[in-house]
Amino acid sequence: LLYELTTLAQEDLKDIARYTLTQWSENQSLHYAELLEKRFCEIAERTAYSRTLSSRYPQVLVNRCEHHYIFYIHQEKKPPRIIAILHERMNMLKRLKNRFD
């Protein structure tokens, strides 16, 4: 297991796939899913450039992939835990509040 997706992050991915399929096409939806998957692997390999979300949550890192931000936590001796994949136009802090458990 290279990385772990929380239940809510899995829901984010499903929402992204549905939206992209509806607004664009199946090919675009598959392409975007591949881009996100590649970025998840880069996060797991620690080769993706990421920054700390804030001083209040120093354990939470954020990485941009196209029009989405991936929020995750690197765990000691465990795969990174991806807690959210949110669109750049969303109110991210509001949506992240319930994911810091």
Model-identified regions with their sequence ranges:
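Conserved protein kinase catalytic domain
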Residues: 17, 37, 83-86
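Enriched for short, Lys/Arg-rich terminal
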Residues: 73-101
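Basic/aromatic recognition patch in beta-strand/loop cores that engages polyanionic ligands
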Residues: 38, 48-79
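Arg/Lys-rich, positively charged N-terminal/basic patches that mediate binding to nucleic acids
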Residues: 1-35
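Residue-level signal for well-ordered alpha-helical positions
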Residues: 16, 46, 95-96
